[in-house]
Design a protein with these regions (language model features):
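Signature of the first transmembrane helix
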Residues: 14-75, 244-265
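Short runs within selected transmembrane alpha-helices of multi-pass transporters and secretion channels
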Residues: 71, 140-158, 166-174, 197-213, ...
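Hydrophobic/aromatic residues within transmembrane alpha-helices of membrane transport systems
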Residues: 25, 37-41, 53, 78, ...
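Transmembrane alpha-helical core residues of multi-pass small-molecule transporters
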Residues: 57-60, 104, 172-177, 200-208, ...
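Short alpha-helical transmembrane segments in multi-pass integral membrane proteins
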Residues: 1-20, 78-145, 189-244, 286, ...
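Helix-terminus/linker motif at the lipid-water interface of multi-pass membrane proteins
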Residues: 32-50, 120-127, 183-192, 247, ...
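Membrane-embedded alpha-helical segments of multi-pass transporters/permeases
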Residues: 32-35, 39, 66, 106-117, ...
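Small-residue-rich hydrophobic transmembrane alpha-helices
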Residues: 50-110, 150-166, 276-306
Length: 306
């Protein structure tokens, strides 16, 4: 049995790939269960709900990217502090980024719910498609803080030297989504199928964000745990700066999707948006591998810089 790789180890190319494989698998699996979600909606809820989900989904992802920013940016800072040998300060930074991310997620959730309808209308939704997009988005936005935390913890599991545990949580979250999709979307009456799909996704995000919160909130065998902290504007700004590339990459990718949808709904209608949604799912799977690699390597570079 191979020895567990630690951040303090000397990394060769092979060791680095081994260390990042769980992060890559974690992101790919996240993308795959998104595809399964689309499969159930398109096959059981209908074309209009599927088009509505694809229309509003990039907007929901943009709101959740704060988790990527504080995850990749914050994990580099925490890893650097661990490399300097200051574990208490590293845990204070870790706790700060978790609390700020959860608070920001709550604020964005309130704003998102309040402005869902005008934003969906701005994207070109109208009539039945508008109502479907608003319904789906508002259910997902109710648990946005957990979605933000899920993205945040995907990075910090690596920093805590627990990438395999991060993969296990992601698989559990994905299986929750798939099973609930199969139960709710197939068994519920037609008028409730889209709400069932949204509820399945929302509950899976509660698992993905809530389980790590409980794990790090208690005594555990990792090098990180939640503790009392104080507001540190400089640390927050550094995390935002460090994670700005991942933040902008995710925003730009989803913004392009939104712009495509605006034009497609204008010239091709629901069929165009639904067709582009299938292509978007395929693109997500391929890009997930590179995002997973960046999540896995950031703490390594941060630790050795410290």
């Amino acid at each position: 049995m191979k020895q567990q790789i630690q951040l303090s180890d000397h990394f060769t190319y092979g060791r680095l790939i081994r260390f990042t494989l769980p992060s890559i698998g974690m992101m790919i699996f996240t993308s795959i269960y998104g595809v399964v979600d689309g499969f159930f909606v398109s096959n059981y809820a209908g074309k209009t709900p599927f088009a509505a989900v694809n229309l509003i989904y990039p907007l929901l992802m943009i709101l959740a990217t704060a988790g990527f920013m504080f995850g990749t940016g914050g994990s580099a800072i925490v890893a650097k502090t661990l490399g300097e040998g200051d574990k208490p300060r590293a845990n204070r930074y870790f706790s700060l980024f978790v609390y700020v991310s959860a608070g920001l997620g709550a604020i964005l959730a309130v704003l998102g719910i309040a402005f869902t309808r005008p934003l969906a209308r701005l994207l070109g939704a109208e009539g039945e498609m508008l109502e479907a997009a608003v319904l789906y988005a508002r259910i997902i936005l109710l648990v946005l803080p957990f979605n933000v935390l899920q993205m945040l913890f995907q990075s910090f599991f690596v920093t805590a030297e627990k990438p395999q545990l991060g993969l296990a949580v992601t698989v559990s979250s994905g299986m929750t989504n798939m099973i609930l999709d199969a139960v709710l979307v197939i068994l519920l009456p037609q008028e409730y199928k889209l709400a069932g799909a949204a509820a399945a996704t929302a509950l899976s995000q509660v698992v993905g964000g809530g389980v790590p919160l409980l794990y790090f909130g208690r005594n555990n065998d990792s090098i990180l745990h939640l503790s009392r902290t104080a507001c540190d504007g400089k640390a927050i700004a550094r995390a935002c700066a460090n994670g700005s590339s991942e933040f902008m990459s995710n925003i730009s990718m989803n913004l392009v999707g939104m712009l495509y949808n605006i034009q497609l709904i204008k010239y091709a209608g629901e069929d165009g948006v639904a067709a582009y949604g299938v292509l978007m799912y395929v693109s997500m799977i391929f890009s997930a591998a590179f995002i997973g690699y960046s999540i896995g390597t950031a703490p390594v570079f941060g630790y050795h810089d410290g």
